[in-house]
């Protein structure tokens, strides 16, 4: 009979899933009210015209239109939603 006890399984070998952050709707994409445009930690992107910001810094659309990114003062990136009539 063998006197060596069999080894147990390791307690490791797991990892947490990714956070699924990032840009969900890119420039010139059509959005409707409530569409999530960006999921982020902190304000890497700042809310501009016709968008709102959630408590977890998620930027979402308030109107139907098209996504537009622009640089503001101090090189901040702003996200706007432009109405279809104002897009040229």
From Swiss-Prot:
GO MF annotations in UniProt: structural constituent of ribosome
Alphabetized InterPro entries for the sequence: Ribosomal_bL27, Ribosomal_bL27_CS
Spans through the membrane: none
SUPFAM superfamilies named among the record's database cross-references: Ribosomal L27 protein-like (SSF110324)
Keyword set includes Cytoplasm: no
Superkingdom: Bacteria
Record keywords: Ribonucleoprotein, Ribosomal protein
UniProt region (Disordered), positions on chain: 1-24
UniProt key word Membrane: no
Entry's Gene Ontology BP terms: translation
Gene Ontology cellular component list: ribonucleoprotein complex; ribosome
Any coiled-coil regions, as ranges: none
Family to which this protein belongs: Belongs to the bacterial ribosomal protein bL27 family.
HAMAP family tied to this protein: Ribosomal_bL27
Protein name: Large ribosomal subunit protein bL27
Species classification: Bacteria, Pseudomonadati, Pseudomonadota, Alphaproteobacteria, Rickettsiales
């Amino acid at each position: 009979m063998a006197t060596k006890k069999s080894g147990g399984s390791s307690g490791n070998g797991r990892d947490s899933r990714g956070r699924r952050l990032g840009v969900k709707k890119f420039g010139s994409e059509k959005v409707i009210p409530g569409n999530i445009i960006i999921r982020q930690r902190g304000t890497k992107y700042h809310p501009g015209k016709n968008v709102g910001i959630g408590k977890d810094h998620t930027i979402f659309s308030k109107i139907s239109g098209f996504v537009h990114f622009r640089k503001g003062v101090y090189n901040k990136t702003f996200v706007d939603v432009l109405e279809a009539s104002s897009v040229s």
